[in-house]
A protein has these predicted regions:
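A short, conserved alpha-helix in the catalytic core of glycosyltransferases
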Residues: 96, 150-169, 174-201
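Glycine-rich, basic loop-to-helix element that forms the pyrophosphate-binding segment
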Residues: 57-74
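N-proximal low-complexity "stem/linker" segments adjacent to membrane-targeting elements
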Residues: 1-23
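Short, flexible, basic/aromatic active-site loop/helix in glycosyltransferases
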Residues: 127-150
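Conserved donor NDP-sugar-binding/catalytic core segment of glycosyltransferases
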Residues: 86-87, 91-127
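Short aromatic/hydrophobic "clamp" motif used to bind/position activated sugar donors
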Residues: 79
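Short, acidic, metal-binding catalytic loop of nucleotide-sugar glycosyltransferases
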Residues: 22-31
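Non-catalytic, C-terminal membrane-associated alpha-helical segments of glycosyltransferases
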Residues: 214-220, 231-313
Length: 313
């Protein structure tokens, strides 16, 4: 069993995948495996089958879904996700793996720099005062972020202890790529240490992502994230955050009209108590690894009860 599974995502842009893959293979650490999650369009022109496991995921709609699928296919104790276009520095993984020597470490947040000017793209993600998702350190100089803390890694470049993440149900797919990594980081903080490692450096110019999220979806996803955090926030903060975020989007709409759509979808979801959340509760919709497992167990249990009833009759 390898210690580290390196997972590279490819959704549309083959050159970005190859840029990342070349750097990973050149600097590949010992005791590791490399997986590529692709949309079915990559044909391995360089015959890398002996070094890389290619997994076709043509039905995947998000990076979050691809990550959950990759965790089920990977063999490593630590899983490292990279979006196509993210290029690691030499020995980048050594820094992160040292932190995992501590048993309480459940995730490591690497530093992502812009390839063009070496300014900070992000040092993970954090939850703002209004419970939005923000990129930590965006636009700052490299040396200015060493004292900053994050709530979790950005999924485009992230390290996780796989057993801990999977024990929590993996990534919540119904939160989309916009909030699933922040949600995972906050949940992992409840069971262990999320370590910010500004000396673990990767670089990015352009990043391969599956799709652009509409303003309507963005507002709905944020409401769903707030609903998940409602118990820890308290009802008052939950309602205040919903209204203040909507008001801010309306006030800034002249600069970005799409924010009106986001505010509308947020308030609509709040009023209707989020149709997707209700569907998950009523129908057992699968939004994570954990929910899939529970649904299978429930079906097996129901089947056993039915069989017992038939025999009794």
């Amino acid at each position: 069993m390898p210690r580290l599974s390196i997972v590279v995502f490819c959704f549309h842009d083959t050159p970005l995948l190859e840029e990342t893959l070349v750097s990973v293979l050149q600097n590949r650490p010992d005791d590791s495996e490399v997986l590529v999650m692709h949309d079915g369009s990559y044909e391995d022109p360089y015959d890398l089958g002996d070094e890389v496991r290619f997994i076709e995921a043509s039905a995947v709609q998000s990076m979050t879904q691809a990550a959950n699928l990759a965790m089920q296919s990977s063999r490593g104790l630590i899983v490292h996700f990279l979006a196509g276009g993210v290029v690691p520095d030499a020995s980048w993984s050594d820094v992160a793996l040292k932190h995992f020597d501590e048993e309480n470490t459940v995730a490591v947040v690497p530093l992502l720099l812009h390839e063009k000017d070496a300014s900070v793209a992000c040092l993970g993600v954090r939850q703002t005062g209004l419970h939005n998702r923000a990129l930590v350190g965006f636009g700052r100089e490299h040396l200015e972020v060493k004292s900053l803390e994050s709530d979790g890694p950005n999924l485009v470049a992230a390290f996780y202890r796989k057993s801990q993440l999977m024990s929590l149900g993996g990534f919540q797919e119904d939160l989309g790529d916009e909030y699933s990594d922040l949600d995972a980081g906050l949940r992992l903080q409840e069971v262990g240490d999320v370590v910010t490692a500004a000396d673990c450096v990767l670089r990015v110019g352009r990043c391969d992502k599956p799709r652009r999220v509409s303003a309507v979806s963005r507002g709905r996803l944020h409401h769903r994230f707030l609903t998940r955090r409602r118990e820890s926030m308290g009802a008052l903060r939950y309602h205040v955050s919903t209204w203040l975020n909507s008001i801010l989007e309306i006030l800034t709409a002249p600069r970005s009209p799409s924010r009106l759509l986001s505010a509308w979808s947020r308030l609509t979801a709040w009023r209707k108590q989020d149709e997707m959340a209700e569907m998950a509760a009523e129908d057992g919709a699968i939004f994570s690894i954990d929910s899939a497992r529970h649904q299978d167990e429930s079906r097996e249990s129901d089947g056993a009860v039915d069989e017992t009833s038939r025999r009794a009759a």
